[in-house]
Each structure stands twice: as C-alpha cells, then as structure tokens.
C-alpha cells in the first residue's frame, strides 16, 4: 500500500498498471486493485484524470494489447467515462492512425461499442461534468464558436465531432479530402504531445499495415453509415442540421464526395454508394411540405412528421384555383373604388405570394404561374364593365401588367445570391411559357387589342432582323405588316417583364410565341410624324405633339425623364403641356413604365424652389397652372386607384397638403390664364387639391364606426395623421428594406419632396379645419360668436346663397344670438364675398345648419335649399366636402324629422322605386340570399331624414360630366354610406332618385343598393357567406356553378349584362363589395369559423360515400380504403380553410385575426355544446376538422404577419398573439385545463398546427417560449408524434437544444 502524502494517486495508478502489464495480470484483478486505491484516495468516479493518465500511458510507449484491455475494463466498471475516453482517443489516435493502425482499429471498435449505447453513458449525476471534460478535450467551443456548459448541447457537438472526424479520416485515407471545399480539416489537427516517429517494430510489416489500413478505412465508412442509420445518433445529428446549417452543409458535401468517389466502399460487403447517399439525403435530414416527397418518407426517415403527410396531401392534385384563391380575392378586393390603400399593392402581393408559396409548399414556377393566372382572371372578369363611378378596366390592367410584374421583380431581386436569382428567372420563363396553354385567359379586351398586336409585331420584327427600338414604333400601322401579328395578353406581360429587366428578348423565340417571321420590313416613318422618339430628339411640345403623346404611352424611362425635365424647367406653357401628357395614356396604359409615371406625377406636386426665387409668396403659386393640370388629370376613379396600387397615396397626400394650405389662403381674385384661354382662380386650384386629398382617407365613411372591444373597424386608421406616418416611415433606411425595389422607390419619391418628417401640425389651417370636422362629427354645432370673423363670413355666405329668400324672411345662423336683418339682403345677394377658402370652410357648417333649420320651419323651400347649397358649392367647390361632413354628422345623430319624397316639396322616387326594389330582390335571389321582407310593394309613403333628403337633392343638381366627376366621386360614396346607415328603404329611395338622373348608371346604382341590405339584416350576411362556401366548394347547384373554385366564387363581375334580365352576381363579388361597411366584424369572423366547421362535415358527406366513411373510421388515416376520395376531401378541406382565412383577414384585418387566434379558437375548443347533433362526428370527420382548423389558423396568421421578420412590429405582434395561443395549448397538454371538443379534432389540430409551422414557417418557431415548446413536444410524444416533437424542438434553436438532446436520448427506440 502506498504511503499517503509521498506520491500522488496518479503515480500509484501508473505503477500499478506497469506492474500488472509486466506480470500479465488479469484485467479484472487490475481493475479491482485500482478501484481500491481510488477509494482510498477518495477519487470521485468516473474520473476524467484517470482516463487521461491511462490514455497517456498507452500513447505510445505502452501501446500493447493488455493495456488496452485494462482501459476497456476501466470503462466497463465506469471508473472512467467512455465518452471521455473516446474524446481522448479521438484527440490522440485519429491524427496518428497512419502509423498506429492497430490502435486506430481498437479505437473504431471502442467507438462502435460505446456510441450506440450513449444513453447508458450519460445517466447519472456526473453527466454535466463528463460533457464539460469532453468539451475541453476536443475544444468544442472553438470548433462551434459557442461557449456553453449545457450538457445536451455539448453532447450534440460531441456526436457531430466524432462522426465528422471519422468522415475526414476516411476521405484523407483515400486521398479525397483535397477535393472537398474544406480540404484543411479542423477535425484532424495533430495532438500537442503526439509522437511523430513510428515504432520500429512495424517497419517490417508494411504489407500487413497497408491491408490493415484498407480494412480500417472500410470499417470507418461502414461505421459512419451505422451512425447515420442509428435512430438516436441520427436524431442528434438532425439538431446540428437545424442549428448549424453551414457546418452541416459541409458535412453533407463530404459524405456525398465519399459516397461517389470512395474505392474502399466498393469492397464493403454490407454497404454501397447508393445506401450511403440515401442516408444523408434531405428526405431524412430535412423537412418539406412538398407532396412529391411525402411518399418517400418511410420508416427510415429521421423526420417522418406523422400527420404532416396528410397536410402535404392537401396539395396533391389541387387545382390552381384552390392553391391561389387568396390571390384572386386580394386582386379583386383591390378593385373596390370606395377604398384607397396606404400600403402598396406590390408590398401586399409580394408578401402574400411568399406566404402562399410556403404554406402550399409550391415551387417558384408554380408561384409565378399562380400570380399570372390570378392577374389574367382579374381582367377577364370585367371585359365589359357596367357604367358608373367605379374603377374600370384601366385599374385591372394596371394590376395585371404593371403591379404583378413588379411583384415578380421584387421576388427575384430578394434572392441573396446570383445563382438563386438566376434560378428564379428560369422559373419565371417556364411559368410564362406554360401560360401559353391558357388561350381563354390570354384573349385581350377590345381596348388593348392594338397594344397586344404591337407587342407581337415587335417580336416578329426583332426575329426578322428589324430594329424599331429608335423609330416611331407606336404609330406603325398594323395593316402594313405582311403577316398576321395578332397578339394576346401574354405578349403584353412579356413586354412588361422585359421592361423591368427580369426577361430578355430571347423570349421572342419561344415556341409558339409569334406566328412567324417576315422578309420585308416596313419603311421607316417620315420624320415629320409626331411621336415620342421625335420629342426625345428635340421636337417642340406643340399642340399636335401633345395630342399624340397624350394618346400614346411612353415606351421608355428616358422619354418620361425628358418629359419631367420639361415639366419642371420649361416655360409655363411647356410645363402645362408636359403635365398634360404625363396624365394621359402613359398613366393609364403605360404599363411598362407606369410606376415611373406615377412617381413623376407625384414629384410634380412638390416642385422645387427655383434657384433665383426671391418673392414673398410661396413658390407653389408660380406653378399654379401646372399643379392644377396634374391634380385634375389624376383625379379620376381609375387614376386614384392606380396611385393607390403603386403605394403613392401617403406621399400624394403629403404633397397635396401644402398646396391646400397655400392656395386656401388666397381669395378668388387671384387667378391665372391657361394657354387655352380658360381662367382658373385660387379657389379652383384649392378645391381640386382639397377634394382629391379627402378621397385619400376615410372622409366619406359614416362618422360613427363601431368596433368590438379594442378592435377597430378595418380602415378606420386611414386618417391624415396615419397617411403622414406611413409617408415618414419611407424616410427610415435599413439593410433589408433597401433591397426592396418598391420600398426604395417610395423612399426616393418621399425624399425628393422633403427629407424631413411631415406632420399635420406643419399645416395649421388644414389642422384647424380637420379639428372642426371632427368636432362636427362628435357634437352639434356651437360656439359661433356674434360679430366674430366666422360670423361675418356666415352672414356674407347666407346673403350670397339665400339672399332673395332673406329679403322677406329671417334665416339665422346657429347660436348667433341675433336675428339677421333683411334690409340690405336683396341688394347684396349678387355680390360674391372675397374670403380665403379656409375662412369659407369654417363658416359652411353654420350656413348649412341655418339653411336646414329654416327649411324645417318652412322659411326655406326644399328647392330653394338645394339651389342655395348648389350655389355655395359652385362658388367654392371645396365647400361640398364640408357640406358632406355636416350632413353625415346630422344623419347619424337622428334628430331631424323625416320628410315626404312626394314630388311636390321633395323629388319623388315613385317613378321607378318598385323597379329598383324588384331588381335588388332579384340580385340577392340569384346570389342565393333570400330576404322575404324586401319584397316590393307596400303603401307607405317614401320618406328620408331631412339631412339625407337635402343631400340627395343637392347631388342630383350636378351634371354628369367630366367637370363634375371629381366632386360627385367625393359626394357619391358618402351619400351611399349615409343612406345605407338609415332605416330601409332609404337606400332604394336614393337609388331610385339617382337612376332617374343617370339612367345609364342603373346597373351600378341597383347593385350598390343591394349591398346595403346586409347592413340591416345579419341573416343576409350569414346566407351570403354560406353561399360563398357552397359556390367555392361546389357542394350544391347554385345559380352560378356547381363546379366550385374561383370561377364560382367570383364569377364574371356583376350587373345586368343581358337585355331584359339580370345575370347572377357571384357571391364573392357581392361580399367583397359590401364587407367594409360591416361594423361587428368579430361576429362575422365567428360566423366564418362556424361555416368552416360545418363545411367539413358537408365535404365528408359529399366526397365520401357512407360505405367508405364507415371503412375509413376503422382504419387509421384511411390507409387501406378510399385513398382517392380521402385525397379529394382533404383538398376540399384545405380550400374551405383557405377561403375562411382569406375572408377573415380581409374583413377584420389584424385586430380581428388577433381576437380569433387569442380568444375565439380557444373558446371553441373549450366549448362542450353539442346540442345541434345527436352524436359526435365520426373520427374521420373530427380529424378533418382538426386539419381544417390548423390550416385556417396558420394561414390567418401568415396572411396577417407574413412568413418572415421584415417588420419588427409584425414580429412583436406575432410573438404575443401566437405565444398566447400556444400557451393555451400547452396548458391543456399539461392538464391545467380540459378541452370539450372531440379528442380526434384536438389531437389532429395540434399535430397539424405544429406540422405546418415547422415545415412552412420555421421562423415562427424560433420566437416561441422555451417552456411552451417543451410542453408541446411532451404532448406530441404522448401521442406517438416523436419525430414531429424533435423537429419542433430543433427549430427552437440553441435555447432548446439541451432539452432536445435529452428528449431524444430518452425516447423509446
């Protein structure tokens, strides 16, 4: 026995081992003696120091079999940790394997024996200490650039290190390591104390060494395959693939290199190249939502996903209509002329396309094709639109031929690498080539046939060797062409893509793109013909040139730049001419350059201060004529929608505010003369600018917008403050946003106007009016002080508008405290007051109130009221906005008595009221909505609230011409909103009066009136939603079609296109045109959820026969019966969920989606009310419900938040709402709460939800709380969803890797 204190315990160990080695002591006896010594010295076992002593003793002076047996015995008795020993040997043996082949062979045997029983080596209290020792030995923190003491993380790194080192050794031994991208392997670094010289006793055994080396290489490769095949090891490696992507990519490349080039592998009896490559494939170490690989996920997969195969099956065989339904809905929704959006359609659709690609597991080819087909369907739905003040074909063509190509360009340019961008361009090419297989969608509307033919002609001329790029191609006569040059929508799309540099002219040579080539090219046109090319060369902007350029869109950015330069720097007449041209065809039909046209027009509204400008007045005054031309030129419904689609509304509003502020400060005596001889005053410029500004926010909507709880009505945030806030956000730069072509363009436009943030406070006069407008909405008029400037303005306006009436009667302004004298009224009635426009707008509410009060008391006839108000609006057209504001507030207050529309005092609707009501009923009936109370007939007289009667009487005094269009476009939607909010039948009465005025608008007016039915009858909303589901799913023979899909949902527009009858209105169109007026959007979303739940049962009953349904009940996942029927049913379930999510998102926006996910869905799961059915649904139907709900919730979230983290605000909201929902699920899985729904529904929902997140939205998983992830994974494990639980934990990142490793180790094999 060694005397304590004289020598260390490790000296004793070495001495004991040396004596045992010399005497050939049995390893068991050596181990027993060693154990006694260690206990004497109180050494804690297993001991890392002991392992280091023994390995150092072996390497290399005592590299003999008996000492290796000693080491093996110490490992068996857990005197040393096998993992520590393997780490030490990896550090000592592998780098010297060329000279220590026998030791290397023993190392491989020990590795094989211990790695596959790794669970046995980490159980116990010393787990963390052992792994820290392993990490120190192998320097894992340096290799993985991660300093951690979590044993699970260290275990994963250890496993990856051991397998990777073995792989590098095999590659090196075969001379293949130099062929890999990382030829200097970090795993083969030589040990610091390694002996270089080989023992002399092996020098004579070169032949046997070479044979042993060959066998060792084969064994190493076979061992690598066994590691990849082993469930526990492979799962641990999967954590590396999820969290160390670059290192895993290198590892995979090296295995592929080994599998494809190894000569030793050819001599293996148990492994071949194909097997090895299969073991490292993405099908085992990856996840995909692509149904094409689902069938390959068998028992050998690392991640089998369980129920995810059912989700992938949803995509199998699904039509484009079902996959891309949200695109069609968003495209059609953007055509609503009652709504402008502060967010660019390019940004919205780019995010939507990425979302649907991920959710559907689609390729970029399919994504691009889905975009093109949805865009073409949008155009085809309105080939012959009805007449009315609504967006027409120009807006739809803008979406199809400009916005969608810009979206595609955005998606391509988001590629981080040139190779990725090139692949995206290839997918674009193939999608456009496939588009040629849809001739029905490609037929151009009549108004663009000429443009399509010219696009085809351009391709033919190019292929024939002609160069028309610099000639007046825009005025070539198609009759001069010797071959048929008929074009279609694809030719226009290709030209739009070429203009954005995402295609080149090689597209012209695609098979079937054009009809052929020509041998004779038409002669060049004479130089004197006015066209864009001659203008660019310096031709003057005379009348002939302007007339030509207005009717023909520019073909290049250079042409627009030249025009913009003239508009800014030219003479006054040239500025007006250039602005006129910009507002022409280049705006409405210049699809290849439309984004630049919109940009230049917006910039023209913020012209620069001339360098030598020194006047006291604002420099905008000098641009009055040009500004007025632009404002009037972009004021049409289509033009405003085009600006909205391009995201220019915030900057447009910001540019209009200083114009309003400045010109509203001048009296009408300030005027200018246009080249045509027409005079315009400051009032005209102000009124046109002010009217356009008001169209950009929800000015024309009801003043009281009801939300539920803290959920605002959709769009209620569209205020001047909000528009400026969005505009100011464009000034903020970031690396991610700067890569976005659209965002960069919006930023440049904003900075061109001002590099500083702009606020409402910057415009004090506008702010005063805006606050008055808000006060008028909130309370009755008050505060008019006798003798004040406002009171004096009111008196002057009353004298001007009602002077003749006041000559004999009293007309009092509100709260004036006096009776107005009538003495001089008649003398002053023809005198026009000279007040600034802002002063008049302050007085208008009091003028209208006084007039309305006088009419109530009989001092003013209805005709005189309407005439006076029209005079006021003619005097200052902008006053119409304040009149609208006043009437809106007064109608909502409901304090005015109704008046009889009898044709004597007020206009009568009797002539066609019954016809209007009959048509409304027919429209609803053909859409599948039956409301008996709307049947025509009845003897009650037609009445309207006094303010509404006055309002409609005022509007019908306007002529329906271009001059009045921009003002009617402001008053019309407000009139409809007010009438819709009044008791029925106010809206039919208003529609009847207007159809008498504008007979050609009959279809539009009747359809508008039919939309308002849903505001008065909640059951009608439910019926319409039910019909949307039935039409989309094709579950019944609806008037439209029983085929289902987009065609049945959205049809072909709306209106009575047939003489003497009404064509059915598609339910989706009717819903999209009315939902914005719905106030309780939360309850609507609940109805949509209810319809989704019930539609699943309808799908099962329609798509699965009763016999198959019974068979499917008894067989898990229906794996033996009715595969085709089940696949069809699953496709329909996805379609129903997609429709539901889209409608909820559109109807309620972010607020309602948050309520749905946070409150509504959990409440549904907790509910136990099954009174509506005698017994619960079958297990299959219950599972289908779970699938539907999972897809519905994920798509709702994805539509609202996006699939990435571009917006920090969106990320925060997603974390909060999704986190709350998952915490609810975790609480249920932990047994803290109990759900009341069917177990099959609950389990399928959770499995489906997690499957969709991990396969389609991995970024979401990284944001989930660690404890929630643990609860979810434990719940999945209890249900046998082990692999899904592993994937979930792996995506949690480093924060869950420790738990994930422990989870994997302790799973049942």
From Swiss-Prot:
Localization: Nucleus
GO cellular component: mediator complex
An individual GO BP term: regulation of phenylpropanoid metabolic process
Phenotype on disruption: No visible phenotype, but higher levels of sinapate esters in leaves.
Main subcellular location of this protein, as a coarse class: nucleus
Coiled-coil stretches noted in the UniProt entry, renumbered to this chain: none
Region (Disordered), start-end ranges: 809-829
Alphabetically ordered keywords of this record: Nucleus, Phenylpropanoid metabolism, Repressor, Transcription, Transcription regulation
Low complexity composition bias: residue spans: 816-826
TM region positions: none
InterPro entries noted in UniProt: MED33A/B
Functional summary from the UniProt entry: Component of the Mediator complex, a coactivator involved in the regulated transcription of nearly all RNA polymerase II-dependent genes. Mediator functions as a bridge to convey information from gene-specific regulatory proteins to the basal RNA polymerase II transcription machinery. The Mediator complex, having a compact conformation in its free form, is recruited to promoters by direct interactions with regulatory proteins and serves for the assembly of a functional preinitiation complex with RNA polymerase II and the general transcription factors.
Assembly behavior: Component of the Mediator complex.
UniProt similarity note: Belongs to the Mediator complex subunit 33 family.
Protein name: Mediator of RNA polymerase II transcription subunit 33A
Gene name linked to the record: MED33A
């Amino acid at each position: 026995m060694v005397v304590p204190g004289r020598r260390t315990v490790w000296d004793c160990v070495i001495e004991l081992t040396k004596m045992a080695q010399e005497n050939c002591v049995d390893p068991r006896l050596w181990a027993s003696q060693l154990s006694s010594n260690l206990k004497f010295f109180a050494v804690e076992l297993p001991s890392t120091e002991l392992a280091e002593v023994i390995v150092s003793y072996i390497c290399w002076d005592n590299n003999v079999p008996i000492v290796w047996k000693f080491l093996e015995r110490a490992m068996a008795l857990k005197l040393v940790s096998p993992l520590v020993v393997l780490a030490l040997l990896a550090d000592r043996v592998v780098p010297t394997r060329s000279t220590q082949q026998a030791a290397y062979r023993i190392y491989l045997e020990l590795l094989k024996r211990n790695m596959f029983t790794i669970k046995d080596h980490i159980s116990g209290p010393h787990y963390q200490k052992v792994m820290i020792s392993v990490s120190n030995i192998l320097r894992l923190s340096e290799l993985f650039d991660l300093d951690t003491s979590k044993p699970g993380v260290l275990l994963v790194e250890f496993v990856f290190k051991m397998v990777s080192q073995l792989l590098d050794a095999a590659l090196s031994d075969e001379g293949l390591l130099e062929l890999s991208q990382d030829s200097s392997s970090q795993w083969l670094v030589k040990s610091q104390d390694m002996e270089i010289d080989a023992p002399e006793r092996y020098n004579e055994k070169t032949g046997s060494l070479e044979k042993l080396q060959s066998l060792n290489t084969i064994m190493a490769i076979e061992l690598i395959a066994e590691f990849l095949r082993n469930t526990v090891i492979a799962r641990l490696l999967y954590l590396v693939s999820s969290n160390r992507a670059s290192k895993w990519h290198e590892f995979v490349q090296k295995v592929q290199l080994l599998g494809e080039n190894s000569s030793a592998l050819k001599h293996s009896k148990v492994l071949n190249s194909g097997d090895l490559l299969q073991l490292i494939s993405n099908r085992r170490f990856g996840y995909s939502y692509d149904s094409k690989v689902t069938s390959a996920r068998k028992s050998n997969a690392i991640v089998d996903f369980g129920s995810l195969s059912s989700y992938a099956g949803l995509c199998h065989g699904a039509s484009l209509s079902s996959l891309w339904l949200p695109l069609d809905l968003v495209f059609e929704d953007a055509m609503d002329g009652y709504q402008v959006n502060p967010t660019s359609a390019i940004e919205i659709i780019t995010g939507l396309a990425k979302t649907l690609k991920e959710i559907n597991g689609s390729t970029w080819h399919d994504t691009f094709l889905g975009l093109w087909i949805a865009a073409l369907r949008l155009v085809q739905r309105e080939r012959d639109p009805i007449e009315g003040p609504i967006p027409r074909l120009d807006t739809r063509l803008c979406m199809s031929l400009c916005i969608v190509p810009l979206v595609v360009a955005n998606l391509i340019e988001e590629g981080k690498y040139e190779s990725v961008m090139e692949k995206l361009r290839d997918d674009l090419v193939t999608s456009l080539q496939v588009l040629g297989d849809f001739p029905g969608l490609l037929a151009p509307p009549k108004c663009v046939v000429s443009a399509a033919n010219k696009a085809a002609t351009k391709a033919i001329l190019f292929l024939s060797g002609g160069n028309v790029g610099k000639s007046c191609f825009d005025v070539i006569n198609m009759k001069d062409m010797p071959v048929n040059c008929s074009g279609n929508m694809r030719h226009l799309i290709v030209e739009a893509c070429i203009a954005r540099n995402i295609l080149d002219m090689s597209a012209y040579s695609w098979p079937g793109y054009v009809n052929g080539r020509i041998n004779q090219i038409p002669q060049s046109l004479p130089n004197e013909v006015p066209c864009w090319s001659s203008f660019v060369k310096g031709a003057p902007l005379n009348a002939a040139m302007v007339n030509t350029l207005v009717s023909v869109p520019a073909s290049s950015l250079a042409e627009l730049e030249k025009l913009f330069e003239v508009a800014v720097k030219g003479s006054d007449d040239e500025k007006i001419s250039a602005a006129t041209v910009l507002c022409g065809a280049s705006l409405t039909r210049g699809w290849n350059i439309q984004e630049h046209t919109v940009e230049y027009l917006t910039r023209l509204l913020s012209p620069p201060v001339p360098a030598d400008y020194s006047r006291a007045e604002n420099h905008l005054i000098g641009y009055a004529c040009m500004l007025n031309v632009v404002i009037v030129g972009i004021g049409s419904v289509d033009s405003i929608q085009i600006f909205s689609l391009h995201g220019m509304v915030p900057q447009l509003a910001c540019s209009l505010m200083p114009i309003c502020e400045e010109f509203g400060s001048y009296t009408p005596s300030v005027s200018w003369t246009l080249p045509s001889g027409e005079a315009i005053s400051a009032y005209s410029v102000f009124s046109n600018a002010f009217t356009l500004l008001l169209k950009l926010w929800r000015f024309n909507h009801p003043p009281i917008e009801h939300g539920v709880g803290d959920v605002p009505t959709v769009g209620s945030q569209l205020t001047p403050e909000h528009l400026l806030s969005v505009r100011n956000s464009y000034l903020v730069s970031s690396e991610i946003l700067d890569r976005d072509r659209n965002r960069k363009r919006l930023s440049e436009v904003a900075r061109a106007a001002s590099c500083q943030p702009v606020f409402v406070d910057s415009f004090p006069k506008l702010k005063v009016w805006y606050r008055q407008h808000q006060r008028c909405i909130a309370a009755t008029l008050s505060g008019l002080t006798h003798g004040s400037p406002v009171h004096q303005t009111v008196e002057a306006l009353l004298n001007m508008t009602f002077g003749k009436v006041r000559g004999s009667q009293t007309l009092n302004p509100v709260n004036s405290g006096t009776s107005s004298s009538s003495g001089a009224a008649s003398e002053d009635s023809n005198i026009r007051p000279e007040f600034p426009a802002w002063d008049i707008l302050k007085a208008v509410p009091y003028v209208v109130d006084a007039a309305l009060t006088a009419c109530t008391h009989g001092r003013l006839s209805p005709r005189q009221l309407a005439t006076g108000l029209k005079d006021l609006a003619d005097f200052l057209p902008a006053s119409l906005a304040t009149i609208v504001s006043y009437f809106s507030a007064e109608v909502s207050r409901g304090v005015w008595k109704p008046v009889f529309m009898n044709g004597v005092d007020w206009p009568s609707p009797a002539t066609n009221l019954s016809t209007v009501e009959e048509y409304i009923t027919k429209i609803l009936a053909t859409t599948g909505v039956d409301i008996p109370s709307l049947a025509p007939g009845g003897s009650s007289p037609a009445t309207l609230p006094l303010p509404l009667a006055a309002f409609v009487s005022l509007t019908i005094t306007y002529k329906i011409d271009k001059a009045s269009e921009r003002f009617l476009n402001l008053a019309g939607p407000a009139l409809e909103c007010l009438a819709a909010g009044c008791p029925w039948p106010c809206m039919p009465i208003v529609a009847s009066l207007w159809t008498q005025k504008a007979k050609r608008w009959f279809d539009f007016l009747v359809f508008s009136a039919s939309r308002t039915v849903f505001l008065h009858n909640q059951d009608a909303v439910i019926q319409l939603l039910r019909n949307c589901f039935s039409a989309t799913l094709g579950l019944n023979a609806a008037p439209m079609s029983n085929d289902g899909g987009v065609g049945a949902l959205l049809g072909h527009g709306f209106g009575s296109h047939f003489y003497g009858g009404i064509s059915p209105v598609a339910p989706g169109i009717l819903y999209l045109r009315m939902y914005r007026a719905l106030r309780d959007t939360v309850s609507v979303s609940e109805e949509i959820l209810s319809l989704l739940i019930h539609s699943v049962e309808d799908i099962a009953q329609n798509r699965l026969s009763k016999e198959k349904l019974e068979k499917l009940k008894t067989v898990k996942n229906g794996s033996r019966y009715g595969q085709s029927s089940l696949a069809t049913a699953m496709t329909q379930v996805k379609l129903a969920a997609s429709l539901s999510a889209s409608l909820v998102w559109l109807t309620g926006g972010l607020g309602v989606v948050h309520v749905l996910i946070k409150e509504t869905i959990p409440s549904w799961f907790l509910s136990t009310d099954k009174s509506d059915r005698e017994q619960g649904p079958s297990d299959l139907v219950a599972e289908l419900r779970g699938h539907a709900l999972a897809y519905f919730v994920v798509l709702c979230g994805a539509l609202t938040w996006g699939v990435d983290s571009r917006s920090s605000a969106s990320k925060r909201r997603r974390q909060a709402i999704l986190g709350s929902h998952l915490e609810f699920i975790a609480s249920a899985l932990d047994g803290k709460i109990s759900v009341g729904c069917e177990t099959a529904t609950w389990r399928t929902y959770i499995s489906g939800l997690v499957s969709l997140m991990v396969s389609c939205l991995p970024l979401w998983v990284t944001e989930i709380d660690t404890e929630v992830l643990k609860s979810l994974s434990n719940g999945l494990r209890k249900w046998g969803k082990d692999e899904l639980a592993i994937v979930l934990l792996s995506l949690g990142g480093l924060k869950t890797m420790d738990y994930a490793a422990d989870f994997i180790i302790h799973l049942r094999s």
